[in-house]
Amino acid sequence: MKNDKSYPFPTYSGLLNSEHYDKIGPALWLFLWFISSTTKEIEKDGVSWGIVLGHKPLKAREMAAVFGVSEKTVRRWLELLENHDYIKAVRAPYGLMISVKHSKKFSFRSDNTVHGSLKERPFSPQTPDTNDRTDIDKTNKYTAADDAVDHIAKRFTQLRSAQEGRTVYPSSRDYQAIARIVAIGVPVTQTIKWLEECFQAFENRRTAASETIKAFRYCSKFIEDRFFAQQAKKNAAIQHERMKKHDKTNNRTDFGRAEKRETSITGGQTGRIRRKQV
């Protein structure tokens, strides 16, 4: 299945070695998808667990569609991942709630920052405090990203449920589309504002109750178009201000030169000046 909305996510290269491939083989693809779909991390009994898509129950059919394989293949991959302790799958009425064991998705950059700091900086009593502060800031940053996805998903659920007249929940693709919006830097409050505008615009156009917004991806383009237009407008305004300052500087320079020419006692002549005949 083609995915037009691709986005980067952090993982460790150690996962891509023969030890892991010997254990789980092609199931590694499903495991990587779980990592990319992790929306938050929790710690339980000293173990970090990555919560996949906010613990939305996933059906084998949904996961099979991601890779274009059969449901039987997905079930075999899930069994391998569970047996080798890569994931924990909890059966729910409408699918499986997946957790990634020893999740490091959101600590990836923090770890690199700390190791780099220890290598590059000389020891001083203040260094640990500075690094601790950096770790806290980084953790807060990724926690904020998780919360952003959850807030947007919650509002999308409310809007869709109101439109459908029944309770509906975001799909895995919805969560991925939301994560992309967060990743490109759209503020949560602005995302929710545009999301509401998107639903309102749809309501104004629809002619039948059966016409509803089925996926967040429909709203993604609406949000992205406005965000990029807003960014372009800001950049144009900044460029305009720079040009104005540049023009003012040039005008001041030219004015100064003109003043010098006007106050010359020789009228601009140089060399020997002949006396006027009377």
Curated annotation (Swiss-Prot):
<dbReference type="InterPro" id="IPR036390">
    <property type="entry name" value="WH_DNA-bd_sf"/>
</dbReference>
<dbReference type="GO" id="GO:0003677">
    <property type="term" value="F:DNA binding"/>
</dbReference>
<comment type="similarity">
    <text>To B.subtilis YqaL.</text>
</comment>
<feature type="compositionally biased region" description="Basic and acidic residues">
    <location>
        <begin position="248"/>
        <end position="263"/>
    </location>
</feature>
<feature type="region of interest" description="Disordered">
    <location>
        <begin position="239"/>
        <end position="278"/>
    </location>
</feature>
<protein>
    <recommendedName>
        <fullName>Phage-like element PBSX protein XkdB</fullName>
    </recommendedName>
</protein>
<feature type="DNA-binding region" description="H-T-H motif">
    <location>
        <begin position="58"/>
        <end position="80"/>
    </location>
</feature>
<keyword id="KW-0238">DNA-binding</keyword>
<feature type="region of interest" description="Disordered">
    <location>
        <begin position="117"/>
        <end position="136"/>
    </location>
</feature>
